Amino acid sequence: MWFKNLTLYRFNKPFAVETEALETALADFTFSPCSSQDVSKFGFSNALGKKGSSLVHSADNRHLICVTKEEKILPGQVIKEALEEKVALIEDEENRKMAKKEKDALKDEIITSLLPRAFSRRSQTHALILPELEMILVDSSSATKTEELLALLRKALGSLPVIPLSFKAPVESNLTEWLKLGSAPLPFEMQDEAELKSEADEGGIVRFKQQDLKEDEVLAHLATGKQVHKLALHFGQSIALLLQSDASVKRLKFSEEFRAGNDEVGTDDPMARLDADFALMGSELVALMHALVAALGGLEEAQV
């Protein structure tokens, strides 16, 4: 359940859907496994996984939701070889060349015949709805997975007025300034990883890892006009993260010391522990968002 990535969106209008109403809305789009002829299935699943019993898990007016996607695995090469074999057989038997339309229809038949025997894979994506911040945080670095979740949530609710988080000044300008100064605004602390890009169309990209970012070698690239597009940071003693110029966060990691804050809850009651962990994570992500918005100079005015 602990988030590992953050793609950030904000609501254009206050999110005023209560837990019970949200649960009811999502229930119409509950995940069900693929049947023998389904290529993929997608829907909402228990927010807290197998041990959970609801599609929405709420605490302190913060709502955790989850979508599950199941996809049949049909290797393209397998389909290609089966199609070529069938086409060759038909063309030999009938002494003619098959038209493209016939080949396409034959390909569909092959896929249909293979589906019942195909393996499948499942993936899950969580999101945290934060009405107090008018934000929704998606635990994914994939634009496709994020959009799929938001599209299904929009379908369930009828509307979902959200836009990507944007700031008054470009994020890369702030990151570049922090690197020049040799420090990030508190409670953030720069670490030893950064990616710099030239703003020129054919400019280069320089990546530093496990290196002191205050060294002249690093700063020399700023003098040539490169800007910082990725920067590793610590948020206090609780979170390590990689902040990107599109305001997304990768490699989000809660420290062991922070997660140990719920050790007194124990593990005898798994649901109690999951609930406590969710409350702990939610409160710290709210604190992170407040600090991030302040450090980056404030949000751009939302267009209603």
Swiss-Prot record:
Out of the domains of life, which is the source? Bacteria
Going by the UniProt record, its keywords in alphabetical order are: Cytoplasm, DNA recombination
Q: Which GO terms describe its cellular component?
A: bacterial nucleoid; cytoplasm
Q: Where in the cell is it found?
A: Cytoplasm, Nucleoid
Gene Ontology molecular functions: double-stranded DNA binding
Disulfide bridge partners, by residue number: none
A Gene Ontology BP annotation from the UniProt entry: regulation of DNA recombination
What function is annotated for this protein?
May be involved in recombination.
- Family per UniProt? Belongs to the RdgC family.
Name of the featured protein: Recombination-associated protein RdgC
Which source organism does the UniProt entry give? Shewanella baltica (strain OS195)
- Quick one: which gene encodes this? rdgC
